[in-house]
Amino acid sequence: MTDNAVLLGEGFTLMCLGMGFVLVFLLLLIFAIRGMSLAVNRLFPEPPAAPKPAPAAVAPADDFARLKPAIVAAIHHHRRLHP
């Protein structure tokens, strides 16, 4: 009976050591990736963003007045072709 308890204790010890090593490795990996990212950004900085062009002028509110004759002509043409 005591042999099983010792074996179970060694199993838990081995499990904790394994999880500890994996945790340490993953933390080191995270810091290494962050360090490489900082190094790359220092050596090869991104170029400054080009200024955005000014927005195009907004069409006047009475734009419908210019389009009204074209719309009427299109409706007339459609009705003439499809009575």
From Swiss-Prot:
Instruction: Give the record's keywords alphabetically.
Output: Cell membrane, Ion transport, Membrane, Sodium, Sodium transport, Translocase, Transmembrane, Transmembrane helix, Transport
Q: What sections of the protein cross the membrane? A: 11-33
* Cofactor (UniProt): Na(+)
Name any one Pfam family assigned in the record. OAD_gamma
Task: Give GO cellular component annotations, separated by semicolons.
Answer: plasma membrane
Q: How does it sit in the membrane?
A: Single-pass membrane protein
Q: Which reaction does it catalyse?
A: oxaloacetate + 2 Na(+)(in) + H(+) = pyruvate + 2 Na(+)(out) + CO2
Q: Does the keyword Transmembrane apply?
A: yes
Gene Ontology molecular function terms on file: decarboxylation-driven active transmembrane transporter activity; oxaloacetate decarboxylase activity; sodium ion transmembrane transporter activity
- Locations listed in the record: Cell membrane
The enzyme's first-digit EC class, named in words, is translocase
Source organism superkingdom: Bacteria
Main location as per UniProt: membrane
So what EC number does this one have?
7.2.4.2
| Biological process per Gene Ontology, one example term | sodium ion export across plasma membrane
The record's section on InterPro entries has: Na_pump_deCOase, OadG
Describe the task this protein carries out. Answer: Catalyzes the decarboxylation of oxaloacetate coupled to Na(+) translocation.
The family line of this record is: Belongs to the OadG family.
- Quaternary state and partners of this protein? Heterotrimer of an alpha, a beta and a gamma subunit.
Q: What is this protein called?
A: Oxaloacetate decarboxylase gamma chain
